[in-house]
Amino acid sequence: MVIASGAIDRRHLSPFTPTSDDSSSSFFSQDLVPTERQVGFWNSESMVDHKGSKSVFASPLEKIQPNGANHAGDPETPGGQAFKGLDILSLSNLMRQENASGSPSLSWGEILTNPISRLGLSTRETAFVEPTTADQHVPGYGKGLSSSSLSEVFSGKSREIVSGVLCQSTGTHTSIYDSDEPLESMEAIEAQTIGDLLPDDDDDLISGIADGFEFTGMSTNQDDADEDIFCTGGGMELENNDSVKGDKVQDGSFKSQISSGHSINKQPSRTLVVRNITANIEDSDLTVLFQQYGDIRMLYTSFKHHGFVTVSYYDIRAAQNAMRALHSKPLGLMKLDVQFSFPKENVPGKDIDKGMLVVSNIDSSISNDDLLQMLSVYGDVKEISSSPISCTKKFVEFYDVRAAEEALHDLNKGGISGPKFKVELSQHGEAGSCLRQQHSREWKQDSLPHQPKNSSPGTIGKLGTKCQDNSTVHNLFSPVNQQLESPTQCISTTGPQILSSPIRIKSTLQHNNQASVGDLSGPLGQGNFGRGIQTLHPRSLPEHHNRICNNSKSMTVSGRNASSRQDGVDHNIQKVGPAGFCGHSFDQNNEAFGFTEIGSCPLHGYHYTWNHTNVFPQSPSAPILWSNLQHPMHVHSYPGVPPHMLNTGSYPMDQHHLGSAPDNGGSFGNVHSFHPGSLGSIGLHGSPQLYPSELSAFASSRGNFREALFSPVGGGFQSLQQMCNAINGRNPMIHVSTSYDATNDRMRSRRHDGNPAQSENKRQFELDIDRIAKGEDSRTTLMIKNIPNKYNCKLLLAVIDENHRGTYDFIYLPIDFKNKCNVGYAFINMTDPQHIIPFYKTFNGKKWEKFNSEKVASLAYARIQGRSALIAHFQNSSLMNEDKWCRPMLFHKDGPNAGDQEPFPVGNNVRSRAGRNRSLISLDTKDASPSSSPDQESNSVGTANSTCRTTLEQT
């Protein structure tokens, strides 16, 4: 047996070096061996006949010397044989031979780590070569396959096998010669080889392989993941963890600087962390973007250069609506990632308690309905629950923290005649944990997809099997604590059970009776999952018309009279109903007590009765008990189904309310105090349910936030809600009385934001027909809200012209350029203030006839007033670069052409929309056609309408 072995000098060779011609000791002078980066098997083209082939399994970090690099006679190559690695195929044959001879089976790792003893070779048959200096400095790269460099040499009928095994401790190479054997079929050899190569230990399988790769983006500090407020995922990574960590050190702790100690949380809260924000976006644009969902309490943009900002709302519904509408929505080149931010445990004044009041010294004769009527004048009440400790104490939760503050100050001063109460802010721990559980469940269920069409708009989710039909709602659920064992019990599963959070709705819900709960004043929208609760007491959810709580045998909590002040308690809240219901009605919004700012009536039907709380059976008078929530049910809230957008107030930076159109930096925001009846029928006072799931964040401006100039703070809100409703085609809203009376007006006027200036600013956009009739209000520009999204300019003009042709000279229907639908509102300028009265009677509080829409139109004053001001505002707008059907329209207001369209004057400094991906297209630049020529602008309205329709069809 001839044995030759040699040590390899790997120091001076290029990745692929042909063997020298005078290398007589090399069997193949022109063979190349793969470089260190080629991991795995590498077969030459001559593999079929196994001549001149090399199969190499190389370590990622190991360099393999080309054959013939060392010449015969070289001190490092005794025997004149060039070093050759052990061929894998030959090794497999060798292993089978050894196994056939009765030797114990050998693993690949054993052969590599102890090749001589394992293979049964005697020391006299093996020549050892002292490692070279280069070899001595080669570190061990683990054990197993990846720590060896192997190759083979076939020559004629004989085969010389020289094995070089670089041991981790010695770096010694061993050469072994084995006699030739007939080769099996390639398939058999390959199968056997793979089996032999795989190590017994999984660690061996991957050891050494990952050593050759540098995972520079992977953080080695586990604390980074804990401190990263974006660890909840979603969106694009902003940067390397290392750089983020450095920024943290430089800018200070996120915990202390972001939202005053807020951190990412799956649970609904009033504060959101929005990531993937473009650093060059203006703060005013962000204000417009966020303000359309409600009054902004704080917009924190210090970390904008890191790609994220935090925004806090007064109303929790605004935060939830913003999250649903904006999460995963494109902003620039990235999609926004919106997450709830919740106060740290060590932060005083928990976010969840800010909207909750503790009302003490309540007479037993006062029901939840009575208390609801008393408190709803301050704002929308989300929940009324009984204290588990005292029957004379109740927790009252407002959607908006400002409503809670107003109620606190007013009630303690004797603001309500009759029984005297002691009112104080809830302290964290008293009801906070229960609220968080309820909010979490509510948000989770609210995130479910659309409710079935056959589901009642205001139906309440199915209750758990343990719910019992008690005489009063508060006893709706048995006090069994087992109910708490299943966080998802009593959660309606009417809608698809698609939850982002880990908690799923259990099958036990199937046993719940789905009796119709009646018409809740507001559509539950997508978020509405429940079908009904047969166990609810007939009087459980009274109707509140004109703020009068009428016990209804149906679960309808019809919204207060449309004219009732928007501040009113969410009718669903009224679910709190006569005795309140154990399944506390929770508006999607996390903070139970934040009332919706202006006219944002709690989401009717959205306040899901979350029956997870066990009601004290012993205290039937206690409608809603949080106390029995012994097991916090934290249902992680993820954005899912967009809820109706409750209009919440306007951002302090731009105090435009109800019907006011924000200026360039304004918001589309929430309309606050528009006429009480305007949205009453919608069930959301001042804020129709909005399903922003398909809402384009910048619908009215094609990405230019400032173009959304007209959406009143509250109006835009409503319009957005409307838009979403129409887009999603679901959740008809229960029509609520839209009568207007002075009583409701007075009730509405009692509510203010704590800031007299803000309250006055909101009221200034309300329509007062009496003042108009007396000539005391000469404003002429109106905002029409809650327009079905499928309406185009032709349909809208046709509806208006039925009775009001010639009474207006300007109209603008903002369009969402993404889906070619309107955004839910329009602006119209009447030629005379007196024309507003018949126009108001025709549209305000009335449903739209087309598309089976349940939306109810409402009117409010726009911020920009007058034809000339409107023209000045738009003539240099980027809208002038858009198709004409997307632009504002002017009409002749007198003369024989009264009512006919006239050209809209274009300014000399028309702005271009930044980031526009396509070339500007305007009918002015297109090939002239009868329907698109600029000359045709003076044609009749019918021609203009035809143009609108044609353009829509073409696009």
From Swiss-Prot:
Could you tell me which residues belong to the region Disordered? 64-83, 436-465, 897-955
Q: Where is the composition biased (Polar residues)?
A: 935-955
Every RRM domain range: 270-343, 355-428
Q: Which gene encodes it?
A: ML3
Gene Ontology process terms (BP): positive regulation of meiotic nuclear division
Superkingdom of this protein's organism: Eukaryota
Recorded hits in CDD domains, A to Z, give: RRM1_MEI2_like, RRM2_MEI2_EAR1_like, RRM3_MEI2_like
Stored PANTHER family: RNA RECOGNITION MOTIF-CONTAINING
Which SMART domains did the record assign?
RRM
What is the designated name of this protein?
Protein MEI2-like 3
Q: Pfam families under this entry?
A: RRM_1, RRM_2
Q: What does this protein do?
A: Probable RNA-binding protein that may play a role in growth regulation.
Please provide, alphabetically and separated by semicolons, the GO molecular function terms listed in this UniProt record. RNA binding
Identify the keywords attached in UniProt to this record, alphabetized.
Repeat, RNA-binding
